[in-house]
């Protein structure tokens, strides 16, 4: 209930609640964290996911707050009005809704997250675990006494790279990740 309580505090004190939806927008749900958690922000910003990687960012918000951008706030864009990215956004949102991509990301990501943790459990590995949400999870390491957590992460990255898996510590699922990709990663 953290976000709900935060919303209440911001409303009570006249503070704008701003969501950075760069990672959550169009991944947790088409409506981002606001839809997923049922909490409406006063302002929210989104990035390239809305346009499937094309250069586009979006600032959304309450009408009264957005009206301030017309006169009282200096606001500048790099690609403002660039039509290709806008067309990509429309097409992307259509596909996200039609194919329920956020649910697919959650399902595939859960397979990876739970698969990783099952391997750790099967081999009694206690110094690492996968946490987070299906669409974006992360592997955490504890120091083992022999090496630091960062060194352990580096060793794992090095070994995964030998098998053609580029991993930065996060799993950012995308619509093209198949069951075969997940099995290959967990192998």
Predicted ranges, named:
Residues 1-187:
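Conserved N-terminal phosphate-binding loop of PLP-dependent enzymes in the Aspartate aminotransferase
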């Amino acid at each position: 209930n953290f976000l709900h309580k935060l919303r209440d505090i911001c409303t009570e004190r006249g503070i704008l609640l701003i969501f950075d939806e760069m990672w959550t927008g169009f991944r947790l749900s088409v409506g981002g964290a606001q839809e997923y958690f049922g909490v409406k922000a006063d302002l929210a910003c989104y990035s390239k996911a809305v346009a499937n990687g094309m250069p586009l960012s979006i600032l959304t918000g309450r009408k009264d707050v957005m009206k301030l951008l017309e006169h009282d706030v200096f606001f500048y864009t790099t690609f403002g009005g660039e039509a290709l990215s806008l067309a990509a956004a429309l097409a992307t949102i259509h596909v996200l809704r039609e194919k329920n991509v956020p649910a697919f990301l959650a399902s595939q990501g859960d397979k990876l997250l739970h698969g990783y943790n099952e391997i750790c459990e099967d081999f009694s590995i206690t110094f690492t675990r996968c946490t987070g949400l299906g669409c974006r999870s992360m592997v955490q390491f504890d120091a083992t006494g022999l090496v630091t957590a960062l060194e352990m992460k580096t060793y794992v990255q090095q070994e995964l790279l030998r098998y053609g898996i580029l991993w930065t510590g996060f799993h950012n699922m995308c619509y093209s990740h198949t069951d075969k990709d997940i099995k290959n990663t967990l192998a």
